[in-house]
Amino acid sequence: MKRIAIFTDGTWNSPGKGSPTNVLHLARGIKPVFEDVEQVAFYDWGVGADRKTLMGGISGVGIDKNIMDCYRFIVHNFNVGDQLFLFGFSRGAYTARSLGGFIRNCGILRREHAGQIPAAYQMYRKRSKSASPNAPGSVGFRRRYAWENITPIEFVGAWDTVGSLGIPVPFWGTLGEKEFLFHDTEPSKIIRHARHAVAIDEVREDFQPTLWDKKPDIDLQQVWFSGVHNNVGGSYDDRGLSDHALRWMVDEAHSLGLGFEKHALDTIKPDHRGKLYNSRRGIYMARSKHQRTIRGAIHESVKRRWQDDVDGYQSRCKPLRALLTSVGNDWDRIEIAGTGTSR
């Protein structure tokens, strides 16, 4: 048995860019062996990170390739009994969640049938009743080419999922919507544990979060953190806020067996007083604001930031103010998620 960890980054993110995202930080910190179990990692650059940056970032045309690249790595490395851990930020989170849907639909192909990956993906893309996971065609495809049983995914960790949209073109709206509606991003029964860190303070209408709905048979936690999109997923120079979301995700994955290098853990330094950046700049100024609505637990660092009124947070954070108003300013009626300790 080994652990296979897949890391998919956000739009225009790549290893050579400034401060690393949380996805890249984790990918660099995976131990090759932890508790006598081999661990292998695959990092996939964000949509639009290659030479086709503009169109890839605007329309998400690279998302098909990202999903298939991640899936191909799994096919080439997987053996029965291996555990799968999937991580992603922004559109990379959308990619990771779509990858989970792809595996649910087509299984994991045996290595000798890796040439069938394009056919498997086309079947997944149909998103029709005839190509659903339980349809005769899908079942027959898996029996012919995939490992015998649909493999459970041990863990999916997402930071502020947005769909294939995300990047607006002024006066044209947002490109790429219809092309990517086929993706199955809902947590399916093959996912055992799912974690989603969501940004409270993001106001760009093109970055509305793709939230998960609770399902009784899945261990799902969706926790809200202070900050805008990249304050939660990382890449800003001031990592105080993003390190809260990173530390939480590390603790959750570690509790399920994933091991990290000491150097990666030692550099995580959460700070609830960290800088809250302004993401509504440039072309986004021409677009409307969209206040997010908090649904679910908030991280304990949010409460501390509010109580300390860091940089006037009590007047600036409208979603949290609305939540507090709805419960009569009674913190005991709000679910608070905390942190643990990682090795």
Protein language model annotation of sequence segments:
Residues 1-343:
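Active-site- or binding-pocket-proximal scaffold segments within functional domains
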